[in-house]
Each structure stands twice: as structure tokens, then as C-alpha cells.
Amino acid sequence: MKVTYEIENGKKVEVITYDDGVFMKFDENGNEIHFKSSDGDEFWSEYDENGNEIHCKDSNGFEVWNEYDENGKKIHSKNSDGDEWWSEYDANGNEIHFKNNIGSEQWREYDTNGNEIHFKDNHGFEDWYEYDTNGNVIHYKDNDGYEFWHEYDENGNCIHFKNSDGYEQWFEYDTNENCIHCKDTDGVEYWY
């Protein structure tokens, strides 16, 4: 690996070159502005004053443009193939609405801890999540009738899994919280 510095447009850039031909160039803020893979593909990126990637292109002519809100969240993207997508966020920065120009749309709801508790899309799929006080998923269900449950020990390790199809798994851990034993309702058993 070889590291050099250059002046580009009046600004110092770091250049890293590897023996296999990989080449990377970073701006003064540490953002990758140019990448060349060992097979010759190249990528260039531009950033706004907050370090958000606003434009990228590759050596095949594919390009992507991005827009961000005042909190640095990506709110709009479009590419040179004509694909376009938009996102909206709540006051905590969680994505609550997503849509694209090919007809997909999604909505999400969150609890006060920022955990996703509800998802639905415009194709009719919907699911719900419940969490324990540590933020671990303890119950999941979807509108197709599938459900699963998790139980955790005091260290947050999953000790039991059960789903609506009747399948179950049990887990045991050592004092270092490494899983040492697992068994399920199919008769499969592992020791680690």
C-alpha cells in the first residue's frame, strides 16, 4: 500500500494505491471521491458541505443524485436509468414514509425508543413488532398469519424461539455469553 498526497482544485487529497491496482482518493474531510477497483471499474463521488454524497458516477456512465434534509437524512434520489425515490422522516430521524416512481410505497411507525413497531406497504403487506425493555424483539406478526416469539435471559441472549408453525428452538450460554448448546423441535441439536 502506498499513500501520497496531491493538490486538486486547490485542496489537499489523500491517494491510496494498492499493489493489486486498487486506487482510492479521499478529500480533505475523509470522503472517498474516487475509487478504482482491481478490474478497472471506477467510481467518483461529490459531497455537500456536511459530507453527504450528492452525486456519484461510475466508468460505465451510471449516475446517482441525492438530496438531503437539514438533518442529513436522504430525502430524494434519482439515477441515470430514470429511477427515483423519496423518503420522509419523523422528528427522531426515523424513516416513516418511502415511495419510488415505479409504484412502491411504504409506511413505518416507531415506539418512543425508536424501534419499528409497524410496517405496511401499498401491496397489502403489513407486520407488527413488540419489544422488551432492552429493545429485543419479543413478538412479531404479519397480516398473513405468521408469528414468532423470542425469550431472552438477563444478559439479552435469546434462550427460546417459537413460531406459529410450531417450530421451536432453545439456546444455552456459558458465563462469557457464548452459545454452547442449541436444540429444536425437529430433533436437531448442536453443542459448541
Model segments located where?
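Short amphipathic alpha-helical segments
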Residues: 1, 190-192
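N-terminal targeting and processing segments
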Residues: 1-30
